[in-house]
Amino acid sequence: MAHGPRYRVPFRRRREGKTNYHKRLALLKSGKPRLVVRKSLNHHIAQIVVYDPKGDKTIVSAHTRELMRDFGWKGHGGNTPSAYLLGLLIGYKAKKAGIDEAILDIGLHPPTRGSSVFAVLKGAVDAGLNVPHSEEIYPEDYRITGEHIANYAKALKEEDEGKYRKQFSSYLVKGLEPEKLPEHFEEVKARIIEKFEEARE
C-alpha cells in the first residue's frame, strides 16, 4: 500500500523477493561472467551467466540432481557436501567452456559465513575458477566433507535407532549409511575430478 505522494512502487522482481537491483548493477559493472548460486530446501543450482542487453545468457549450469544422476551421489541435495560437489562440477564445466574467472552472485541469499552457497564457491575455486573472495567465508572442512552429519547420525543411532531410520530414510533407501557420508563424499568428488581431468588429456 502507498505511503504518500512520494512513495515509489518497487520493481516487480524486487517486490517478489527475486532481485536486488542495487547488487545486480554492481555485479554487472564488473564486466565479468557471474557465478550464480541459488538454493532451495532440497537442492542447489549453479550457473555461469553473462550479461546481454536482450537478456542474460547462461553459458553452463549444474544442479544437484545431476550429481545424483551422473556421479552416484546418494546424499541430500540441500546440504553442504552436495553444495561443494556442485561447485566443483560447475567450476570444471566453466573451465571447459573457456571461462576462467567469474564474480559470485548469491542473489537475495544472506551472505552468512560458512553457508552452503559459499561451499559452492569453494568447490568452483578448487576446480580452478578464479572468483574474488575471502577464504574466511568458507564452511569448515569437516562440514564440507559431511563429517558433522556422520557424527550426528552415529550418536542418533545409538540413542534412538527408530528416529535414526526415520530421519535418514532417504540415505538408507539408496543404500548409504549416513555415518559413511565423508567416505562417500570423497568417492563422488574423485569421480567428478576424474571425468574432467581425463577430458583435458
Swiss-Prot record:
Which InterPro entries does the entry mention? Rbsml_uL18_euk
Q: Which GO terms describe its biological process?
A: ribosomal large subunit assembly; translation
Please provide, in alphabetical order, the Gene Ontology terms of the cellular component aspect for this entry: cytosolic large ribosomal subunit
**GO molecular function of the protein, one example?**
5S rRNA binding
The domain of life is Archaea
Q: Could you describe the subunit structure of this protein?
A: Part of the 50S ribosomal subunit. Contacts the 5S and 23S rRNAs.
What does the protein in this record do?
This is one of the proteins that bind and probably mediate the attachment of the 5S RNA into the large ribosomal subunit, where it forms part of the central protuberance.
What this protein is called in its record is Large ribosomal subunit protein uL18
Source organism per entry reads Thermococcus onnurineus (strain NA1)
Q: Which gene encodes it?
A: rpl18
